[in-house]
Design a protein with these regions (language model features):
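Active-site PLP attachment segment
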Residues: 122-170
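A short glycine-threonine-serine/GTX helix/turn-capping micro-motif
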Residues: 169-183
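Alpha-helical structural signal in soluble globular domains
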Residues: 11, 33-40, 67, 89-100, ...
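Short beta-strand elements in bilobed, periplasmic/extracellular small-molecule ligand-binding domains
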Residues: 41-51
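Active-site phosphate-binding strand-loop segment of PLP-dependent enzymes
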Residues: 44, 55-109, 113, 134
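Conserved beta-loop-alpha segment that forms the PLP phosphate-binding cup at the N-terminus of a helix
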Residues: 1-17, 28-31
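Structural detector of well-ordered beta-strand residues that form the stable sheet scaffold
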Residues: 21, 46, 105-107, 128, ...
Length: 183
């Protein structure tokens, strides 16, 4: 998911002054990526303190939503946190964000093979998951899901095969499915 999230972050066209809201439970390398690009592009990466324990999903949603402002354009959260194994109520967050026009980017690194995953039910704008953790796939096996209406805004991190002519009818897949030889 690190590569997938970096691909997404690099593609964002947030205006200076806008905010990405996250939590203080996120994975370190992705926090660093958000901080790097927010400084480079002039938007703010805000980490909401989420004290634990919380008593319900609604308690979590209400606490997290206190961090949303009129400048919040993106919410970035883990589905299952790396450090504590907490399962965040992502479906509820995504539903509320969608109703308010906020894009959701979900780091599901620890989800595939660990708990049930139904992206259609969760309905995030962007979701990524690691297949090498609980599915025992080769290291680096990851997927990136992007809602169709946002795919045209996601540029490949590495340009290689597929960026010009490929048999897939979906340009997003052409540009991102194969990133060349790793050497």
């Amino acid at each position: 998911p690190t590569t997938a999230i970096n691909t997404v972050i690099r593609s964002l066209n947030l205006e200076p002054g806008f905010e990405v809201l996250s939590s203080d439970h996120e994975y370190g390398s992705l926090i660093r990526a958000w901080e790097w690009f927010s400084k480079e592009k002039g938007y703010f990466f805000v980490q909401k303190n989420l004290p634990i324990p919380m008593t319900s999903h609604q308690d979590f949603v209400d606490n997290f939503w206190e961090g949303v402002t009129t400048k919040t354009k993106i919410i970035f959260l883990s589905h299952i946190t790396s450090s504590t194994g907490l399962i965040f109520p992502i479906e509820e967050i995504c539903k509320r964000a969608r109703s308010e026009g906020i894009i959701t980017i979900i780091d599901g690194a620890h989800v595939p093979g660990h708990i049930k995953l139904n992206i259609e039910t969760i309905n995030p704008d962007i979701y990524t998951g690691a297949c090498h953790k609980w599915l025992s796939a080769p290291k680096g096996s990851t997927f990136l899901y992007v809602q169709r209406e946002l795919q045209e805004f996601i540029s490949p991190l590495i340009v290689s095969w597929g960026n010009d002519v490929d048999p897939s009818p979906i340009q997003f897949i052409n540009e991102n499915q194969y990133q060349g030889t790793r050497d």
